[in-house]
């Protein structure tokens, strides 16, 4: 399945905040379990009333901060990308795809936020993905005769 069975065995449940700390590579990942609910509440309050001219920045921040908090035992990346796109759509902006072939650049941009709390690299990356997503969509539409 899409949820890590070993984490289920430790009492973790899909859709629930994590109950344990996790290590990815050499580093502990995210907020301690006892801080997750408060940090998520603060994040949602921060982005709730963003001005229209700052929606893309807020979407990038929402995604980066969710990954930084790492609220779930598994599926944080998928959830963060989905939430970012939902936020964009709710604010009349198009969604985007984080393409597999550029994942190294994506992870580096997220690491830049984790290390320095800077969104510049992530915003640049996401803008490129937005353009690539919709260039491919337009190309496919024209190729299939929908552009007539």
Residue positions per predicted region:
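FIC/Doc superfamily catalytic core
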Residues: 1-74, 78-148
